[in-house]
Structure formats: C-alpha cells, structure tokens
Amino acid sequence: MRKLFGRVCAVATAAVMMAGTVMAQLPVSIYASDDKGLVAAATQQPFRVLTAQEMVEEMGAGWNLGNTMDGHTGFTPNETLWQHVETTKQVIKTVHDNGFNTVRIPVTWGTMIDDENGYAVNDKWISRVQDIVDYCIEQDMYVIVNIHHDGAEQTGWLRIASDDFDSVKEKYKAVWKQIAKRFKDYDEHLIFESMNEVTGPGNNIQFDMDRVMELNQVFVDTVRGTGSNNAYRWLSVPGRYTNITNTTQYDFRLPEDTVENRLFLSVHYYNWLFGLAENTTYTEWTKDMTDELVAEFAQLEKFTSQGIPVIVGEYGAIDKRNEADRAYHYEVVNRICNTGMIVACYWDNGEYDLEKEPTDYNFTLIDREKCEPVYPDLIAAILRGKYLEGPADCSDLSKGTQIVPITDFQMDKDVLCIEVGALYETSVKDILPEDTNDIVLWKTDDPSVATVYDGRIRARGIGTTTITAYSQKDGVSKSMTVTVIARKGAEDIELSVPEQLELKADSYTYINAKTNDAKEYFTYRSSNEDVVTVSRTGKVLAKTDGVAYVTTTASTGKSAVTRVVVGHKAGANEISLAVNVYYNDNDNSYFSNEYGKPITVSGDGTYTLTFNCEEDLSDDAAKAGVDSLSHMTAIYIKDHDVTLGEAKKSKLTACNIMYDKIVVDGTELTITQTEPKSALKSSGIFDTNDPINSWDGSMVEEVVVKKHVADFKDIENPKTIEITFTLSGMEFEGAGEENATEDVAIESMELEVVDNEDGTYSVIAKVTPENATEKIYFASEDESVAAISQPLAAVENGKAQVLANAFKIGGTKITAYAEGMATAEILLGVSGITPAESEAASVGDIIPAPEVDISHETDEQPTEQQSETESTTPEETQTSSEADNTSEPGQQTSAASSGATLSIGAAVAIIVGVVLVAGIVVVILLKPRKDKTTEE
C-alpha cells in the first residue's frame, strides 16, 4: 500500500506524457566552460518567520549538550575534555526521540581565537561546532549556539570589568561576525545567544548590567549586519549573570534591533541548596519551594507580558539519589514555562557514574555512549510539565506522581503523500484510558526524507520513511508511511556538480552545486557515512579512507552525483607532543593554558620535553605579569594537534608513559610513580594529566597545593621544567589492520530493469567478475519520476539489486557507480499503472509545498521597513490535519500557526489525474473530503 499510495498521489498531479517518453539527459561536469547560464545554487535556506508563541511551541522541551564544546583546560577547548563521548548523529537522534526539540550547544572559543591574526577563529573548531549544529538541523531541531566560558566570572577574555573594555568589544564583535557569517544561510532553527553567565568581580550590579547591555547591542548589530537569514533570525540576550532577579529588578533593556519581535530574553535557574550544593543535606523538593519558584518566575512577566519570549538556558539539580524529588522539581519548572511563553533547556553535563558518590556533580539524563536515557522518569517529568495542561501555580503537582500508561491510541491516518518542503500537522486520537497522564512521542526512520516533532511532519527529501508515534511509558506505538515527492516547479531545471572531489581524512569542502534556477534548493545524500557525511547545506566532511558518492537532488527532482575519494592524512603514524602549563594565577588574574615547543613521536622510546618561561610564554601571559612556573593548576603532556584544535582526538589506540626524570631550574625532583601508566584518557586523547596536578595529585614530592593551586617547594620563581619520559605499547589507529580476504574490484557491469507491476522497478547490476566485493551505489537522474530506495547494494553471486519507486509518468536515467571507477547506465521509463493500483487513488490528497522565496544574499543590512515587508515572503507553512485541534489527554499538542492552516478539503477542491491503464487514458477524480470538525 505504501508504494501504491505514493505512486498514485504523484500521478494525480502529473502532466500527460506519452508512454516511453524519456526526460532529457543532464550532463554532469566539473563546471566546464560550456556551463553557460548556470549560477551558483542558493545556499540560503527557506526561512519561516514565526511569532514568539509559535517559536516557543515548536522549540518544545530543551536540552543542553553540556561539558562538551564548552569543556576546556586553560580556555583551550576540547569536545571530550570534560566528558568522554564524541557527539554523533545518533546521540542527537536519541535526544530528539526522547522528546526534546531544542539543543543548546555551549561553546568555549578561548584559545581557538587568534589574537595575533585579527581574532581569526580556528577553522577546525568552528567546523566541528557546525557539524553538531547540522546533526540537530537534520532532525529539524532548534539549536542555540553561544559564547560560553569565555566570560566566566572575569577569568576569560570576555571581561565586563576590564579597564580596556573597548578592546573586549572589538574582539567580541570580531568573533561574533565570524560565527554569524558561517551560519548566515541557516534557516529559522538556528538561534544565537550572545553570552553565558557574565558578571563582574564585585557586587556592582547596575554597572555590570550596563556593560552586558552594551555587549548585547554589539552582538545584535554584528549578527544583523552579516545579512542573509541573519537579518531575520531569532537572537537571545541575557542580563547580568543570567540571573532572573537581577534582570527583572534592575534597569535591563533589550538591545535595539532592525527587525521587530525577534529577540529572546535568556535567564538561568538553579536552586543553590537543592540543585548545586555538593552534599546530601538538602535532597528534598517541597511545596514551599514550588511556591517560591512560581513567585521567582512570575518576575519574568515583566517581559512575557510585552510579547517577549524567554529561554531558560539552564536548569537542573545534582543527582543526590533523590529521583522522585528531582522529577517533582523538573515538572514544576516546565509547567511554569509552559504557561508563560518560556522555553526551558535542561543542563546535561554528559558524565555520570552510578558507582560514585551521589554528590559527584552529575546532571546527566542521556547516556551518550549507549544512546539511551539514564533516568527515563526524569525525562517523563520534564515532558509532563511541558505538554500536560494544569494550573500555573502547580498546586496539582506533588512528589511521586503515579503514571497511568497509555494502552491504545490511533493515528489520524496511516499513509501520507507530501511534496518536498511541505509541512503537515498530524495527531493521535482515541487515546485510552481517558485519564492517562502519559505522553506521546514522535520519531522518524529517515530524517533526510521527513522529520517530525509533536506531530509536525516536514518533508525534506524525495523518498519514503516511517513516522512513529509511541507512548513514553510502555511504548505503545502506531506508524504512518510518508512518501515525499518532488515539488512542482520549472520543468527545465539544469544542475551541475563536481564529478569528483579528493579529500584527506578530517577535512571538508562544499558541493557548490550550480543551477539555472537561482531559487532552487537541494538535499544531499552520502552513499557511505562511514567515509563521508554531507549536511543539509552541502558540507562534505571526510571521515576515513575510502570512496563514497554524494547525490545532490533539487526539490523538483533533478539529481546529480559526485564521487568523493578520501585518502590518508599526512603523518598518519606520528603524533606531536608538548608540555602544557595550566595557570591558576589569581595574583595576575591569569587562568589560561600555555605550551612549550612540540616534538614529533612515531613509536616507543625515551623522549624529553621542556618548557621555558622566557621563550614559551605567550604575549597575553607576559602582559598579565606571568613570568614563572608558579600558581598553576597542572603541568602535563598533551597531543599538540588537539591543543591547537587541529584534531579532536589522538591517532593512538594505546600508549603507556613512565616519567624517568623531571628537572626544574636545574633541580631534579623526586618521582613518586615508578610504573608505566596509560597516557590516553577515555576520550582517546594523549593527555597525561600530570606530573603536576593540584586536583588529582602530583607525581613528584616537591609540590605544595593550596586551594587547588600548585607551586614548587623551595624553588623561587622557577623558569624552566624538563621532563624525560619513556613511551611504550604505542599503537596507531589502523596499524596492523589487514583484510581477511583481498578486495576484488568490479571490472565491468551492465544494468537491467524489471517492472514489478506494483509501482516499483527492480534495478539489477550484473558485474564481472562475479566474486567482486565492491558495493554499488545507484542513483536516479530525475527523482520526480522515480527514486531509488536503499541505494547502496552489495554484490552477491555477480549481481547487485535495488528497488526504484515510481512517482509519475516519464523517464529517468539510472546510473550505477562502483567504489572503483566502473559505471553503467540505463533508462527507466514509467508509462502507466496497473488496474489494481487505480483504486489507491482514493487514499488521499497530496500536501503541496509552499512557494519558495530565496533571495540572493546581500551584504547590505535591511532597513526595518524592508524587514517587515520581506519577512512575510519566506517559506509560509501550510498544514493539514483531520484531527480536532483540541488536545487529547497525554498528547503533545501545539496551536496551529495563525492564518497558516488549511484543511485538505479546503485546500484541494478537486484534483484530476491522467494515467495510462492498458493503453487507455483514465481520468481519476479525487473529491474533497470534509474535515471531522465540519458537519457532514
């Protein structure tokens, strides 16, 4: 039924074509000189202009990717420094599928900013931030990106009490300009937050507030000035320290803006004794505490009453083995937010160990390694607060809520046909039992085809996927088959992409498609995401050696393929190491990381590293007055490429280290650890964490530690340290890996097509030799006619086979690409449907895509008048649902966008399709259906 429905829906809107007619063949070239008339494809994504209430509803429940891109040592950030799991698409999908639709990505930029080069931001660092943003955008989740620990209580460079505040503003502007330009073409799902918890050293609240407001104005002006979608983007700005009382009781004003009603207020909320104090004295959340919280959040009405939405960027509580109390607290927070135009983002710090003490500063909800919830009942409490109706004073809530599980429900439909770019609002109905307080969640099998959250289905790319609604408590589930077809548009779209790209592992480039329609936009697909990934913006990221094919598909169906070859990265079997000194110098207000001259290591052996203050200290350290190895958090040896942001982790799978000799200013120290230990952290980074460490202990006797500050005993103002060490058991990634069987390349292949007479076609590649081990990637040149399902296939007994789903009468060229250079082509003609399929036409109507308006980017900042007139033309949402807008018990609900909702019956008065059946032209009339809210 899935294939029949999608097929006939498409046929019902297709123009009549003679049987056997084939679409014109499109050449794929590397932008040869004969590409006349082709222009760079628009990278600016369609942007929906939503009201504050619509944004809050779509953003749903929020979650922080905490201790990840914000983790740092001496303001040198690293993704796995404060937690050990590298963020993946699966991590983000797990967050989404557990009910969250907003991810806040705190980012520390720190030493990734080159003060000596116009404040240039390290490209690999911002590229990694972009990758994680793309993982979220792929699910159509909202994403918040900020400047985080750079302004940490006067220890970073973003110091609001600086005597040279103009220089701070200059650097702040330069950094935000680069971030904004990098993301300027992203759609409405990306939000920028100006800063994190910024405050001065004293208690001069209004002085601090004035400085914060000054920076907020620089932020807004800078982002808006980069143009494209940044001219309309939602931005978020805090008051002093993101404190609710400071922000509401002192003179805090939002910055002036060139576009109206596009600013969030950012605040944080933690209850100090219950949520942050590292002891088990305060573990209970009470009704009195709830009343106090309601009163504190009521202060935010100063802004929400004016239509200004609020983001609670962080909230949460340490795990003190008090799950029921934390659940009560989280439900209260989200109930208050749900009734007050507020989005709440839970602080998840990503690291937990249930064997440790309960006060070990654990906020974790999601196990990022296993991709599963750690505390599902806490997530359930968050979502109950967000989606179940109740009084704003939370008087109906209490500790130990008993869940009445959903036992059954129905989807509003089983199948859906929708054009690329369209949005459809579905719902569940007939929920049993009626008194349930369970929640219905949503997920998609393939977000590249269609995404979903809270019943909102967005068509992203041609193909078929399954949308599943399921109850949170016991997993009662129902599914809908969604077929996405090409949107109606120009018939003569041309498309050109590079034939081949060659990359090194860990590098990236962009597809940079060219087209004769500047308003066309594209989706991208990689044949092998282990080798190459590709984002919604066409960013191609090389991950490991191999060959992959990237298909670029226009929203109207035209597609082209790029072969991507990923080769060895230079220096694959060597690593660069350096001594690092992490200062914790309150006397000079210097809290940063310094490093010495690196050495290159390629195997086991004995090596020596040095740090010389006169030669190795940076200009910033010298300017601050630092001139010796004093007042430190740690001295340690680390992978220098990781320190510089050139690598996320080390190229090693194993390595042990033993300290042989440590000399400070000519004095040899007494080493207490005489056995080898692992030099790798659990994150895979070569980082010894010692021999000097004021937190975890040092490997020498001549160190004194006070308040986590380390100094050398009896050595006055030491200038140099020399560390001699032995490495053993060193193993590089990929070393010694050999295939059990030698790969057998495809020498030649030919294709054949078999009509399965059910709206699908089998495409079969016959290869020589028959024992070839390469996989084959199949692509359709015009996916509006037919698209390949599961396009990558292995060779078995000399054949590889895939399935093509037909969408309309016409023709398309199918090309098969081997991992080597072998290719083959065949024309697939869709001429009609069988009599048995014709009855499927009554299943439903097509949900059409909205008109696309992608203007050319401009460096000119739009005036307020331009913003008002132009902001109504980007992608407008047209939605449809059979279900009543009234929420059912336990169901995630959201109000329809004002003036943007059309029922199928009202939107499609009549559809006439012309198909060929046994050589006879048959006209199928699809009559409009009445909505269930309409009297029949």
Locations of regions flagged by a protein language model:
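Extracellular Ser/Thr-rich, low-complexity/disordered mucin-like segments
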Residues: 882-911
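Aromatic-rich peripheral "rim/lid" segments of glycoside hydrolase catalytic domains that contact
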Residues: 322-405
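An active-site-proximal structural segment forming one wall of the substrate-binding cleft
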Residues: 85-100, 120-147, 156-191, 215-224
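N-terminal carbohydrate-binding accessory modules
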Residues: 29-102
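Extracellular beta-strand ligand-recognition surfaces/modules
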Residues: 615-653, 696-711, 718-722
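Active-site region of glycoside hydrolase catalytic domains
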Residues: 170-281, 295-318, 339-342
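C-terminal membrane-anchoring or membrane-association module
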Residues: 916-936
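Extracytoplasmic soluble-region selector
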Residues: 403-570, 738-857, 895-906
